Amino acid sequence: MTEKVKQHAAPVTGSDEIDIGRLVGTVIEARWWVIGITAVFALCAVVYTFFATPIYSADALVQIEQSSGNSLVQDIGSALANKPPASDAEIQLIRSRLVLGKTVDDLDLDIAVSKNTFPIFGAGWDRLMGRQNETVKVTTFNRPKEMEDQVFTLNVLDNKNYTLSSDGGFSARGQAGQILKKEGVTLMVEAIHARPGSEFTVTKYSTLGMINQLQNSLTVTENGKDAGVLSLTYTGEDREQIRDILNSIARNYQEQNIERKSAEASKSLAFLAQQLPEVRSRLDVAENKLNAFRQDKDSVDLPLEAKAVLDSMVNIDAQLNELTFKEAEISKLYTKVHPAYRTLLEKRQALEDEKAKLNGRVTAMPKTQQEIVRLTRDVESGQQVYMQLLNKEQELKITEASTVGDVRIVDPAITQPGVLKPKKGLIILGAIILGLMLSIVGVLLRSLFNRGIESPQVLEEHGISVYASIPLSEWQKARDSVKTIKGIKRYKQSQLLAVGNPTDLAIEAIRSLRTSLHFAMMQAQNNVLMMTGVSPSIGKTFVCANLAAVISQTNKRVLLIDCDMRKGYTHELLGTNNVNGLSEILIGQGDITTAAKPTSIAKFDLIPRGQVPPNPSELLMSERFAELVNWASKNYDLVLIDTPPILAVTDAAIVGRHVGTTLMVARYAVNTLKEVETSLSRFEQNGIPVKGVILNSIFRRASAYQDYGYYEYEYKSDAK
């Protein structure tokens, strides 16, 4: 004989380290769940990146140049130096309704034509199939107010003809290139680039709504501080449309800037056009008065001194008129307390003082000379004013015609070649990380809130006897997996583990249980053993059937009664039929003495559950069941009764009154200590003592760091 013993001693570490190790081990055990969930997230991300609508980006560059100083105020000095452009204000102008509204009107953006596709995946599928360029160009679409809530659908018949219908009953047929008018609806389709049968939804948006959409998709930033260069970026689904939209925005911004710059000249020209006739009229009146006075006084000539005074007064009036123009310009930029404005006012005051002195000299002249000086001054001053206005008019006309504004489009809009979003690599990576995190958190939370029994010591520390610890059979697990893949229920086996692989560690543990039962049942009132469970699907029937098999191998007659009349499957496990089973016996349709069915294992008989009755618990409370147990106890060395889980139904509490020994099966890492204690409490309330617990399906866990260690034993015959 060859004996192999393996001991895996758990390290003795601090509590914090044990907790970390347990968490890591829990994740390692559930690695396939983690991998599976992460793979699902990654797959969803891949599908999303394939079917999500790509968003493109177009950009343009504009420069805001510094305004040149006005010719009328350049000579004021350094106080009138040029200012850097106010970029923040210009950014707001670009995003204003004035600029964007004109773009909406120019490009007919308030009319949207969208192809009808399958929800979510349709547009992406069309792109994959190369059909994303199917479009219908609509330039005019109006409908009466009562139809504003209706949805209009355009159906393509061919590359020239189409039909237009609405969910309100409207229907019409039209041709591309011709205006369709019917019942107040006006539609102009310029071109059709789509397959026959394609459907499009035609929508009319409000101008304000489209402006808001443009503002959401438009980004304007300044390149550098006070650099006067603005970067415009626009995002959207259509590569060509976003380029056209951004070009239109830049062009409209430039045009409004030019209009704003030339508006002042236009207003000044209009004012001069109104003032020139009046000034000319006053000049004519002054000339007529002077000529009449000269004729009346026989052409009076002025002495040299009077002429000098007259020339000085005319010159001062000309300077005062020039200052009036300058003051009009400066007042737009500065207040009267500004040094430049104060300089102008001081110069005006000096001229006024000089003019007052000259007026005093004129007053000292003879009356005839005073009058001729006054009339001559009025004529010459009027002529200078008139000529100044004519010169100003010509300047303004030149200014208006040559205005270029402060905005220059440096780079026209161009759509970038790549896709702005979705960023496929980043999305897939993010989905993998998210799936990994969520799966790990889920595994840890499940482990935290569902702490199954992880060692026999947990039960023993609470005063619960553990009669056997049965390891998980890899041989049985492999056979169950094959059966599952083939679509057969896991419990439908043709061979017990005790027969198919009698040297399995699980069977050795059941043999150890057989030895323990031999001594445990010595003081029992009868030879009837009830096997119950804490909850469903814990391997109770597996333990019960294999225990009966190994006991029968000791030359003892064993009867297994399947008392789970709801879901019992022992007859399938042992390869027998379900005819004339327990339910038929209890309702009097079967004979107790002939109910036992032999199995393929010698001295091992079975009473199957029979047909599923409507009242299993009531049948177990009948006298007929007591008679069956008494008969079986007398005719067999051991009677094993397989009952349903105590936490699920009350059948085990009923059967327990007729047995001498009760054992309860709990599954390792599945059932909790609370469930075991609750089950024992149920039996205690019904006066049924439970001898102990069988811990089933023990496996080596990565998270099970225990100070008692983990042992594996193999004890096989030497090969001959």
UniProtKB/Swiss-Prot annotation:
Post-translational changes noted in the entry: Autophosphorylated. Seems to be phosphorylated through a cooperative two-step mechanism. First, Tyr-569 is phosphorylated in an intramolecular reaction that generates a significant increase of protein kinase activity. Then Tyr-708, Tyr-710, Tyr-711, Tyr-713 and Tyr-715 are phosphorylated in an intermolecular Tyr-569-dependent reaction.
UniProt keyword annotations, A-Z: ATP-binding, Cell inner membrane, Cell membrane, Exopolysaccharide synthesis, Kinase, Membrane, Nucleotide-binding, Phosphoprotein, Transferase, Transmembrane, Transmembrane helix, Tyrosine-protein kinase
One protein family per Pfam: AAA_31
Transmembrane parts of this sequence: 32-52, 425-445
Phosphotyrosine modification, residue list: 569, 708, 710-711, 713, 715
Ranges facing Cytoplasmic side: 1-31, 446-720
InterPro entries cross-referenced by the UniProt entry: AAA_dom, Bact_polysacc_biosynth/exp, GNVR, LPS_length_determ_N_term, P-loop_NTPase, Wzc-like_C
Compartments it resides in: Cell inner membrane
Enzyme class: transferase
Cellular component annotations (GO), alphabetically ordered: plasma membrane
Enzymatic reactions: L-tyrosyl-[protein] + ATP = O-phospho-L-tyrosyl-[protein] + ADP + H(+)
Membrane topology: Multi-pass membrane protein
Its biological purpose: Required for the extracellular polysaccharide colanic acid synthesis. The autophosphorylated form is inactive. Probably involved in the export of colanic acid from the cell to medium. Phosphorylates udg.
Family per record: Belongs to the etk/wzc family.
Name by which UniProt lists this protein: Tyrosine-protein kinase wzc
Native organism: Escherichia coli O157:H7
